[in-house]
Amino acid sequence: LFINNDLKGTTSKKTIYFSKAIGKKVKYNTRYSDRYSGSGQLTLVDGLTGSIAHNDNYWQGWKKDNLDVTIDLSKVDAISKVSMGFLESHGSWIFLPTHVVLSFSIDGKTFENKTEISIRDGIQNGSANRIECESGELNLSARYIKVVAVNRGTCPDWHPGSGGKTWVFSDEIIIE
């Protein structure tokens, strides 16, 4: 905020991603938790990423369930890469998915060209981190992109909540 060319407020910085998915329809095949709903239906396709604070309203969370969504690009388009942002915060029982499965469709019924992205866990009980995973180079066309981030389900033996239900948190899906 400036008054007479004098800065009167604090500055902030936010990265905005431009993607073919921005503002597109997202079908939630598994619903996110009402407790961690981000900004609602468009959270994963709004171009905004979360901080390392899980409650900053940029993250959506799934407890024990997989993140399972289908994005409708509204027309068939060339796709070269898919990226996703995830939060890892073991102290809050938030773990990275074990892997992500992407599949693609022209008609929204038949999905093919499955691509699996392996994700390696971070340091046990390390500090919170935002991790971005990506598909690598794709060379295909599709209208619908199905994204399934597989939740590990339960906290590992080394965790204080061993056996308890884990969370998967995501803030953005970027389609190039």
Task: Kindly label every feature range from the protein language model.
Residues 1-68, 87:
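Short, compositionally stereotyped local motifs that mark structural "simplifiers"
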Residues 2-4, 46, 101, 118, ...:
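N-terminal non-cleavable signal-anchor helices
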Residues 31-33, 118, 162-164:
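Short intrinsically disordered coil segments
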Residues 38, 125-126:
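Short, solvent-exposed polar/charged micro-motifs at secondary-structure junctions
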Residues 51-115, 127-176:
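Aromatic, loop-rich ligand-recognition surfaces of beta-strand-rich domains
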Residues 118-124:
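Surface-exposed loop and turn segments in beta-propeller and other repeat-based domains
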